[in-house]
């Protein structure tokens, strides 16, 4: 099994030294991700493409899914590799492979070539196309919009048949740009803005301001883990949780109602700036869009930035909410975001849309900044790669079972892609498929006389969801543990 990885076009127009560095980093990222799932994978970089090989054909669907989510990959090709002797032999092998597929179809041949040969790419197209047209009576050549495009690549002494093309997410490889710290709330905006910086080549760390208790943090961890696991698992990243309940309490008590929203955002970016400074992170990222809510006017955003002490990036600044939700759906965070309440908006009934700097500074003089400093000092720092261990510590009241009882129903909370690829089939046992991002909204609709045993591949999401359900009063949940 072989894949040819084609690079994001912006990488190819870089200078030689920069392009080589980007390709080297992307090669390492691909290797880091695929090695976890297939120990036979070999990743080799070339001047303008990367070659991926595997000995395990059964892993093909999973490797395709992984490659589609790695930043820096524009598209990749599934190829069948064969030796060849000459141009006529290329035609013979193409005829053997494509004869049945071209019956009663229009077609064209597209060829690419690397190395020294006695023929050009155009000559391959003409010779092979003419031969196919002669030997398959019901096939017809059509150069524009044919039914079938026969794709051939000649790489020195190897003939490559293109079996399929898959699109990647593009962007730059993670690690080619500096680290950033994303202010993640679990909503639509912060999830999408985090993804956009991942795709642009930054290693994204996450800073969460907890305003809603354990259930809020569990929901945010689900989103963060999803973003990291799907798009950024080539790198170690940090999850920082800061309990902001005392800060909000101080604001409610000391700050004028109309100024609360701007002051709260200033406190958040102050705290995030301190965290960023501690880890030498160059910028913080927010999901704010111009005019979307009262605190997101240019006047207010400028005042918020003044408190940050570092660069503030807003990748969604010109996006409409409809666009943001569409992107959230595309990257798989929509349903998680739907279940996440918006805590920041509840503290101010009449927010100002044009805050005055002097008024904000005067209000902040009433604020006890020791409370903010204490919140930052007592922040929880977590390596996302160890989130499973931390989750296990937090769900000691959740039973893990490997033997099922008569009243137990397996609740498969994997994504639809995972269940399609590897369905869970247990003899004489009911299995309900309910993706993890729909559990919070749809679990209550299930038959509550049953006991539900949650299952996912690694046990991380199932533990998070079980804790979430327990927090919300559902005691008929356990976690499925595979027997060793």
UniProtKB/Swiss-Prot annotation:
Question: Locate the Rhodanese domain: which residues?
Answer: 404-483
Per the UniProt record, the lineage of the source organism begins with: Bacteria, Pseudomonadati, Pseudomonadota, Gammaproteobacteria, Pasteurellales
Put simply, this protein is called tRNA sulfurtransferase
Q: Alphabetically, which GO biological process terms does the record hold?
A: thiamine biosynthetic process; thiamine diphosphate biosynthetic process; thiazole biosynthetic process; tRNA 4-thiouridine biosynthesis
Q: Which HAMAP family match?
A: ThiI
Q: Which UniProt keywords apply?
A: ATP-binding, Cytoplasm, Disulfide bond, Nucleotide-binding, Redox-active center, RNA-binding, Thiamine biosynthesis, Transferase, tRNA-binding
Predominantly, its location class is cytoplasm
Compartments reported by the entry: Cytoplasm
- PANTHER family, alphabetized: TRNA SULFURTRANSFERASE (PTHR43209:SF1)
SUPFAM superfamilies xref list: Adenine nucleotide alpha hydrolases-like (SSF52402), Rhodanese/Cell cycle control phosphatase (SSF52821), THUMP domain-like (SSF143437)
Q: Which residues does the Swiss-Prot or TrEMBL record annotate as the active site?
A: 456 (cysteine persulfide intermediate)
Pathway(s) it belongs to: Cofactor biosynthesis; thiamine diphosphate biosynthesis
């Amino acid at each position: 099994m072989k894949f040819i990885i084609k690079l994001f076009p912006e990488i190819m127009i870089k200078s030689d030294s920069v392009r080589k560095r980007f390709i080297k980093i992307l090669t390492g990222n691909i290797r880091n991700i695929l090695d976890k799932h297939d120990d036979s994978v070999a990743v080799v970089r070339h001047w303008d493409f990367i070659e991926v090989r595997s000995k395990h054909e059964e892993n093909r669907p999973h490797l395709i899914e992984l490659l589609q989510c790695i930043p820096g990959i524009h598209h990749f090709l599934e190829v069948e590799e064969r030796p060849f002797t000459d141009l006529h032999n290329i035609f013979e092998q193409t005829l053997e492979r494509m004869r049945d597929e071209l019956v009663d179809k229009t077609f064209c041949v597209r060829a690419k070539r690397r190395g020294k040969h006695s023929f050009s790419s155009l000559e391959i197209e003409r010779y092979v196309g003419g031969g196919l047209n002669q030997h398959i009576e019901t096939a017809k050549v059509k150069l524009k919009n044919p039914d079938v495009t026969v794709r051939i690549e000649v790489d020195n002494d190897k003939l490559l048949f293109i079996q399929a093309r898959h699109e990647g997410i593009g962007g730059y490889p993670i690690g080619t740009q500096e680290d950033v710290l994303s202010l993640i709330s679990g909503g639509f905006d912060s999830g999408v803005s985090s993804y956009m910086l991942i795709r642009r080549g930054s290693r994204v760390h996450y800073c969460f301001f907890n305003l809603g208790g354990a259930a809020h943090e569990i929901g945010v961890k689900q989103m963060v883990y999803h973003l990291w696991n799907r798009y950024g698992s080539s790198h170690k990243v940090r999850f920082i949780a800061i309990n902001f309940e005392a800060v909000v309490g101080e604001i409610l008590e000391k700050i004028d109602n109309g100024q609360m929203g701007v002051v709260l955002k200033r406190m958040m970016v102050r705290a995030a700036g301190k965290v960023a400074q501690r880890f030498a992170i160059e910028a913080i990222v927010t999901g704010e869009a111009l005019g979307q809510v009262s605190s997101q006017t240019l006047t207010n955003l400028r005042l918020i930035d003044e408190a940050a002490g570092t660069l503030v990036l807003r990748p969604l600044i010109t996006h409409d909410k409809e666009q943001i939700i569409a992107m959230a759906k595309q990257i798989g965070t929509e349903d998680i975001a739907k279940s996440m309440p918006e805590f920041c908006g509840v503290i101010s009934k009449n927010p100002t849309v044009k805050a005055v700097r002097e008024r904000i500074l005067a209000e902040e003089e009433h604020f006890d900044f020791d409370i903010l400093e204490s919140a930052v000092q007592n922040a929880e720092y977590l390596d996302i790669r160890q989130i499973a261990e931390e989750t296990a510590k937090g769900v000691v009241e959740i039973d893990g079972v490997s033997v099922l009882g008569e009243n137990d129903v397996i609740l498969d909370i994997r994504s639809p892609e995972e269940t399609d690829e590897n369905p869970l089939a247990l003899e004489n046992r009911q299995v309900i498929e309910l993706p993890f991002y729909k559990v919070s909204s749809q679990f209550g609709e299930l038959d509550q006389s049953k006991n539900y045993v949650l299952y996912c591949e690694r046990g991380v999401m199932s533990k998070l969801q079980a804790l979430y359900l327990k927090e919300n009063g559902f005691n008929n949940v356990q976690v499925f543990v595979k027997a060793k």
